Every structure is written in structure tokens, then in C-alpha cells.
């Protein structure tokens, strides 16, 4: 296996090639963002959530709930929350119902404490969005992002950068969902003179409320705190596909983003901090692996690494066994810098 120093002439050519294939106007990336982004801002990821759920359930008076958790806790500790609850039985759905409001409240309260930090902190992700907003097509200044994250980090960053966010909801205090806002944003928004992020959240968001058949988006923290049990998210343990198909907003988010992954269009994929834990969405994503793909993630599943070793259009930066790696044009290298870290990536590719 070859060794490459990042700050060398040999790597300069690789940087320029990746920028052309993955970060240019002609190959504007569709971006998939996982919990790797949440972690760098201090918002709890799945590991911290699992610890919090364990503590909350231990304090519950519901013995059946404790028993169900006990049945899965070894798997959760060994393979993470999502994998540990992936095969939850039909008669164990009480656990899923219980963890939804706990999860919503935990993420909401954690994020609320960090709003100022998120807004003020300069990260590689900020620089990436700022760079892409200046690179995007002059005719349609829209950058598409899909995230399974519940938090509002992306929205806060966009406010900081002065980039508008198209969420699919319209209204000021109590936004209502309209599929057409996602599908045809140019009918409503000025996408020629201003840059926009079109944000798809197929697993919901901590500012979505669904109560008594009515759904709305609000950023009023007091309302969200009061209505935490009605926050609309798909939690670990849920049948993501089933919930995603029965909830209209989740389904629209998924379907509209999948439609953007059209093989006839020019685009690339930039996947950051995403764990590939949604089988049905990942199937659509893998179909787009014929395009140029750039993956930045500390931990990458073996099957993704194997795909990169087979396909020259997939570039991966990741960490394994205390070493940093790059797979580039089907060849694996050890490198001297953790380029999977978005801050390091931005230093190298954006400056």
C-alpha cells in the first residue's frame, strides 16, 4: 500500500481532480449529511443518545419497557443504537413509542444550549457551503442537501452565511408543508439572484410538530418544549421505511430527493459523516454511485470500502486502526492527515 503526504506535489494533482469531479459547477454535488456534522458542534450523536435512553428507561416504572430494553442492550452496546434496535419485534413496539419523545426532548434541549456556539463557530462545513454557494449555477442557485439528522445545525449555519433555506414549509410562525415548494422552488423563491439550500429531512426534525392531525413547523422553543411528545421524527427502532411511507411529509422528502438522483443529470455526490443505516434510501443512493462520489467519514462500512475499490469514480477518506486512509481511483493509500475531518478537508480543498 502506497503512502502519500497530503502537502506534496503528488497530492496537488489529486486535489484538483477531486475539485473538478465533485465540487465544480458542472458537477455540483448533491450532499448527504449524517451525524458526523452534529458531533463536531457538540450535539449528541447516536452513542450519547443510547446512553441517555438507557438512563431514562432505567428510571421508568414500566417493567415491560425495561425488559424489552434489556433484550437489546448488548447489541446496542456492541453495534450502536440503530443496529441494536433494527430487528425489534412487533410486540416490542412499546419501546419505540417510548423512545420517540425522549429522543426529541433530548436533542431539542441539547441543541438549544448550543445555538450561539453553532452560529459563531467557524467550521469546514461553513466554508464548504459558502464555497458551493459561490460556485453553483447562475441560472438556478440551489444546493440540495439530504440529512437524517433531527437537529437544525444546517439551518443555523445557513442563517449565519446569509443563505436561504427551502424546507418545504411556508409561513412565519406556524409553517405548513407544501410538496410543490420542494419540487418547484423557483416558482416561489428568487433562485437567480440568491443562493438557496433545499433541505430534505426524511427522518423529520425537532421543529416539526404533529398534533391532532395537524402538522406544522415552528422555531419557538417554548412551544417545542411544551409539545415535545408531538415532535415528528423517525427514531431508531422504528420501521423507517414503513413510517416514511405512511407519513406524507417524510414520504415527500424521500421521494423528491430520490427524484433528484436522476442519471441523466449532471451532478456528483458528497457524503459527509453518514452511516449508511437506511436500507431503502441507501438503495437509491447506491444507484447513483455511477456518478462521481466523495465520502468523508471517520468510520466507513466494509461494503462501502469494497465498492470504492471496485469503482474508480468513488473517493473515500476515512480512519481505521489508528491510521488515515484514502481510496482514490480504486487504489488504497495511507495518508498523513485525517481528511475525513471536515475542517481538514476544507483547509485542503477550499483554503
Q: Which residues fall in each region the model found?
A:
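SIR2/sirtuin-family catalytic core signature
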Residues: 1-31, 37-39, 243-244, 255-351
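Extended, H/D-rich, highly charged conserved domains that either
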Residues: 75-85, 137-234
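Gly/serine-rich nucleotide phosphate-binding loop at the start of the catalytic core
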Residues: 1-156
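Acidic, metal/cofactor-coordinating or nucleic-acid-engaging core segments within structured domains
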Residues: 215-268
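Short, flexible loop segments at boundaries between secondary-structure elements
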Residues: 62-64, 175-189, 295-307
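A Trp-anchored, charged/polar loop motif used as the substrate-binding/catalytic surface
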Residues: 10-17, 121-131, 180-186, 248-260
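Short helix/loop capping segments that flank catalytic or ligand/cofactor-binding pockets
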Residues: 40-42, 154-156, 208-212, 280, ...
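A general structural signal for short secondary-structure junctions and capping/turn motifs
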Residues: 20-24, 29, 134-138, 146, ...
Amino acid at each position: 500500500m502506497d503512502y502519500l503526504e497530503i502537502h506534496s506535489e503528488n497530492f496537488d494533482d489529486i486535489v484538483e481532480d477531486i475539485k473538478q469531479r465533485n465540487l465544480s459547477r458542472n458537477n455540483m454535488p448533491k450532499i448527504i449529511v449524517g451525524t458526523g456534522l452534529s458531533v463536531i458542534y457538540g450535539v449528541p450523536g447516536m452513542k450519547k443518545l443510547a446512553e441517555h435512553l438507557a438512563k431514562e428507561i432505567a428510571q421508568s416504572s414500566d417493567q415491560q419497557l425495561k425488559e424489552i430494553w434489556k433484550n437489546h442492550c448488548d447489541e446496542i452496546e456492541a453495534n450502536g443504537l440503530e443496529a441494536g434496535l433494527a430487528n425489534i419485534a412487533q410486540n416490542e413496539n412499546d419501546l419505540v413509542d417510548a423512545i420517540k419523545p425522549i429522543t426529541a426532548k433530548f436533542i431539542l434541549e441539547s441543541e438549544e444550549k448550543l445555538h450561539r456556539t453553532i452560529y459563531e463557530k467557524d467550521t469546514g462545513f461553513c466554508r464548504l457551503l459558502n464555497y458551493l454557494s459561490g460556485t453553483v449555477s447562475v441560472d438556478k442557485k440551489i444546493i440540495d442537501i439530504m440529512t437524517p439528522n433531527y437537529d437544525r445545525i444546517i439551518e443555523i449555519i445557513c442563517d449565519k452565511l446569509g443563505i436561504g433555506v427551502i424546507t418545504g414549509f411556508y409561513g412565519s410562525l406556524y409553517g405548513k408543508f407544501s410538496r410543490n415548494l420542494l419540487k418547484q422552488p423557483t416558482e416561489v423563491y428568487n433562485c437567480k439572484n440568491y443562493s438557496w439550500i433545499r433541505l430534505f429531512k426524511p427522518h423529520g426534525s425537532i421543529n416539526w410538530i404533529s398534533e391532532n392531525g395537524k402538522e406544522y413547523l415552528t422555531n419557538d422553543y417554548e412551544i417545542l418544549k411544551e409539545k415535545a411528545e408531538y415532535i415528528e421524527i423517525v427514531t431508531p427502532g422504528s420501521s423507517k421505511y414503513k413510517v416514511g411511507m405512511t407519513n406524507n411529509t417524510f414520504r415527500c422528502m424521500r421521494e423528491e430527493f430520490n427524484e433528484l438522483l436522476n442519471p441523466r443529470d449532471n451532478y456528483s455526490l458528497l457524503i459527509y459523516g453518514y452511516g449508511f443505516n437506511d436500507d431503502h434510501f441507501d438503495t437509491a443512493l447506491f444507484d447513483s454511485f455511477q456518478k462521481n462520489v466523495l465520502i468523508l467519514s471517520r468510520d466507513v462500512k466494509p461494503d462501502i470500502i469494497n465498492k470504492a475499490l471496485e469503482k474508480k469514480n468513488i473517493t473515500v477518506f476515512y480512519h481505521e486502526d489508528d491510521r488515515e486512509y484514502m481510496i482514490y481511483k480504486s487504489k488504497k493509500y495511507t495518508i498523513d492527515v485525517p481528511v475525513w475531518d471536515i475542517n481538514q478537508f476544507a483547509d485542503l480543498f477550499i483554503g
